[in-house]
């Protein structure tokens, strides 16, 4: 296998750890790569942000491959999501404490499977208030944290597949294949609403982005070994061509 030239450009798939921000993962890879290559800077970007409480596939592009970010982000994404029915939180996940509680005794496995069918295809989804969506030039999460009132417009998305993997009330686990821009936190909210019971995300793992699967990803603790085995050290020519 020909070694990768990170300076000229390469695409790498990493498994983002729990609690790490997408920026932290990019910064970690950049620092490790610069140290290995003996350079001071390296252009690195990522395709598709993951919340700190989510794990899984994160695609990084270096050098000229940063120009492929939009193309990579447009790929279909697959997630495994755990949803807690019967309660809601302001952020639609476990970042905040529950703010409302609802009964779940009426929810059968058949009811969940029927509700999930209603989300397949083209749907309209209102993003979470605690999100990076911009409202009059400001991030929605900044306004939400300050207690400001505002409305977010629904976005048109596509859910290609949605499957119930586990049913153990009040928890359910689903697999989702969807288009760019889908908020699985918002999907958890909407599934809870469809079942006449609130819902919020308790765990989220992205298992695919386009053709990149979780099995193809390197863990953070394996970055140094990956660099040594698969990345070419720079020559004088490549050092001077750093984008």
Where are these regions (language model features)?
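Catalytic/RNA-binding core of pseudouridine synthases
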Residues: 1-243
């Amino acid at each position: 296998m020909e070694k990768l030239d990170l300076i000229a450009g390469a695409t790498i798939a990493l498994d983002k750890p729990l609690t790490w921000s997408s920026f932290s993962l990019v910064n970690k890879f950049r620092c490790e790569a610069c140290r290995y290559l003996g350079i001071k800077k390296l252009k690195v970007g990522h395709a598709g942000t993951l919340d700190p409480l989510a794990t899984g596939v994160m695609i990084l592009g270096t050098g000229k491959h940063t120009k492929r970010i939009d193309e990579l982000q447009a790929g279909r994404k697959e997630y495994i999501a755990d949803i807690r029915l019967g309660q809601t939180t302001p952020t639609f996940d476990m970042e905040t404490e529950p703010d409302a509680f609802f009964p779940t005794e009426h929810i059968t496995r058949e009811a969940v499977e029927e509700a999930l069918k209603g989300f397949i295809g083209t749907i309209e989804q209102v993003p979470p208030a605690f999100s990076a969506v911009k409202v009059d030039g400001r991030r929605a999460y900044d306004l939400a944290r300050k207690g400001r009132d505002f409305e977010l417009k629904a976005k048109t998305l596509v859910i290609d597949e949605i499957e119930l993997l586990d049913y153990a009330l009040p928890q359910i686990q689903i697999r989702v294949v969807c288009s760019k821009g889908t908020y699985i936190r918002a999907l958890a909210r909407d599934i809870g609403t469809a079942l006449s019971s609130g819902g919020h995300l308790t765990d989220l793992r992205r298992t695919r982005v386009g053709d990149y699967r979780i099995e193809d990803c390197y863990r953070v603790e394996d970055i140094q070994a990956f660099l040594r085995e698969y990345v070419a050290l720079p020559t004088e020519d490549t050092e001077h061509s750093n984008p």
